[in-house]
Amino acid sequence: NTYFGFNWMDPVVGEGKTPEERERNKKLRQAISIAMDWEEYIQIFEKGLASPAHGPLPPGLFGYREDGAAAFNPIVYEKTEDGLVRRKSIEEAKKLLAEAGYPGGRDAKTGEPLVLNLDFQAAASPSTKAMLDWYQKQFAKIGIQLDIRGTDYNRFQDKVISGNHQLFLWGWLADYPDAENFLFLLYGPNAKSKTGGSGENASNYQNPKYDELFSRMRYMDEGPDKAEAINELIKIVQEDAPWTFGYFPTSSAAFHQWVHNGKPTQVVRNHIQYLRLDPETRVKAIKEWNKPIYWPLLVFVLLSALVIIPAVALHRKRERMTARTTEEDVK
């Protein structure tokens, strides 16, 4: 999955130190989450081959239910009367931004414009300009100025490990197909800036309720209790919004007709051992594909004859005319 994260240690977009700050910062994160139109991003930059994420858990894994939290984020989306799911309006995002203390994108106390920083893991270049412009456009919709702090990847990693990042783009390719391997990305003890970089929680997100429930869920066998725990964990991070959850890429693949059990996947990387080949079908298909096709050669010969025969006749006619002219000149 690909997501847009907030550093929980940052005073503006992070957790906050007081109850008032926590509520303000949370509403700011929620406003940004609504403004980030991932449906548009998918159509422009992923050619439609992805699905918007409502939480950290992708479809297809245990714990993902179409009627559960993983499939619907009520903080960012709403359901229409006919049951369709749509992103909440920009007006709703602006309302949350005002409640966070930034009406129109300005600090209500100082009048200063709100400027946030995207720490990007590459220097700005023509190949990334369109994408970075798109991110700035999303923030501008609610009046926030987004500055791009591009740098090389090593420097970016140093900033994340030291906790000096504010907003960032990140992604995760699971090690194994289990909800634990996605939900641990938000487990407090895995905070990257607090573990010297060994943890995978790049947002440094920490919530005691989430951490306690996750520590129990990770060792549960698949069943109703684990499914309910996963559902509750997703609800917690939807409310806290440490990420705008981004999108899950769609898998695609092409297989010959003699390959069986071939299935597109984003997670399983040792899938070759599960494939079954039909050698007879393969040999038959190869023979069919390599069967000589003579009609193009015949057409070529006929066309060549239509061109060459008249050309030869014309050449001989000119030679005879030249010979007669030479004889008359001699006489």
Residue ranges of predicted features:
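Structural transition elements
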Residues: 51-100, 122-131
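Short, solvent-exposed loop/beta-turn-alpha elements that line the ligand-binding surface or hinge
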Residues: 4-24, 63-90, 105-114, 159-163, ...
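Structural recognition of the beta-strand scaffold that forms the well-ordered cores
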Residues: 2-7, 34, 43, 55-56, ...
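Bilobed periplasmic-binding protein-like "clamshell/Venus-flytrap" ligand-binding domains
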Residues: 43-46, 100-122, 168-171, 219-257
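Alpha-helical transmembrane segments
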Residues: 303-318
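Periplasmic binding protein-like
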Residues: 118, 137-193, 229
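Extended ligand-binding regions for polar small-molecule ligands
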Residues: 10-43, 210-227
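Cytoplasmic C-terminal tails of single-pass
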Residues: 320-331
